[in-house]
C-alpha cells in the first residue's frame, strides 16, 4: 500500500514547496524507494493552459498531453518517474467531476456539499494519482490560511485518520524572516502558521524553515517547543545559488531518514554520487557563453523555467557556464538589435499573441545574417519560417494566420485535423474553445537523413512534447526548400513540419523545432538538442573573441580581488 507525505506551506507563497518535494523525492529514490509526486492546485481553473504566464508562470506539458503546473517540471527533473495528467489536479477539476456525478444522479438525490462530497473527490483523485508508488509526496498549493486551500487540507486530514498511523507524514514549509535592525531570525510567523495548521487538525511531523542564513540552535529549540515538533525534525532550509544543491542540503540534516522512520520504511542508505557530480560540473566550468533569450514574458522568468533549466543542464554536460540574458522583444522593435551584439547564441521560445512578434523576427534575422547559433522553439520555429519567407523568398507581408488572418502569404495556419498517439483523430476550428484544445503531448517525429537534426539526435525517430495550434503551411514548403530552408523533421502521422534548419554550408548552427525539447531535459542526461546548441555557442564564442575577452575580464577581477 502506498504511503503519503503531505507538503504544505505557510506564512507566504512561493517558498519553494515544489523544490522541497522534488528534493525529498530524489533522496528517497536514491534509497531504492519507488516514489511519485502529486500537485494539488486550489484555483478554480480546470488547468493552467489558458492562464497568463505573468500570473502563473510556465505551463508544463506532460507526455500524455496534460497542461500542468510548472512544479511538475521540477518533479521530472529531480526523479526518474514521468508525470501524467493524474499528477496534477485543481479545484476546477474536482468541482467539474462532482457536478458531472450529480447530474448523472450518482448521489441519489442527496444534497451535494463540500464535506463530504468535495473532500471525498479530492481523496479519490489523490489515490488515483499514486499508481504503484511506495511513497507518494503530495504538495498542496497555496498557503495555510487561504480559503481556497481548506477543502484540500481537510481531505488530507481525513486521510491521516483513515490510514494506518505510519502511512502518513506531514511536512510544513515556512519562512523565518531576518530582521536586520534586530539582528535575528523571527520565529513568530512560523509559530502562528503551525498554530493555524493544528487548528485544522494537522500536526506537522517535520518543519522546513526557509531563511537566508543558518538556523541557530537556540531558535531551533524554540521552534520545536512551540510547534510540538521534535528538535531534529526542525530543518534549516537556507537559500542556495542552485536548486540542485538542495537534496544534499536536506540529506545532511537527515530529512530522508526522518521521513523513512516516520513511515516505517527500512531502506538502503542514500547514494548522492550522481548529484555530487552534477554540482561539481556546475561549479567547475571550462567555458562560458552568453545566450539571448528573446521573449515577451521576460519580466517573469518563471515563464521560461524549463527552458532556463534545460540550458543549465546543457552547461553541466558541456562544462560551460551559461549566462542567460532575458531580452524583451518589444525593446528590439523600439531600439533595434544592438542588445544582441555580444551574444554567443540566440534563442526564441514559444509564446502566443501578436505583441512582440516583429522584434523576435528581427532577432532571428540578426542570427541568420551574422552566423550566430540560433535555436527556435515552437513559435520560434514559426517565426523563423516567416523571416525566411520574407527575406529570402521575398514574400513581403508573409505571416501566420494567427497574427494576420488576411496575409497574402499564409506560411503558417491553424491545424484543423491530426491524429494523436492513441490513434484518435482530433479536429479543431477557429471557433473551438481555447482550453485544452491544442496539439498536446508526446508526438512521434521522423528525422531526415543527412541533416543536422539527425546527427544531433543520433536516430531517425524521436518523441517530443507539443503545445501549439498553428503549423507550417505545406503549400509553401517546396518554395522554402528551393530557397535553401531544409525541413529536417516531419510528424509520423500527418507529415506536418516539425523541424527546420539551414544547411551548415549556409549557417554553422540554425535549427528550429515545433515541439518543446525543454520539457524532457534533465540534469542527469541533458537533452541532445540543447547540448549541441551550447557546443555551437562555445565554438562561436571562441571564433568571435568573446571567450578571450571574458577570460581577460575574469583574470582582471581576480587580480583586483587579490589586491584588496
Curated annotation (Swiss-Prot):
CTP binds at residues 13, 146-148, 186-191, 222. UTP binds at residues 13, 186-191, 222. Mg(2+) binds at residues 71, 139. Pfam families: CTP_synth_N, GATase. GO terms for cellular component: cytosol. The keyword Amino-acid biosynthesis does not apply. The keyword Transport does not apply. Residues 290-543 form the Glutamine amidotransferase type-1 domain. Keywords: ATP-binding, Glutamine amidotransferase, Ligase, Magnesium, Metal-binding, Nucleotide-binding, Pyrimidine biosynthesis. Belongs to the CTP synthase family. This is CTP synthase.
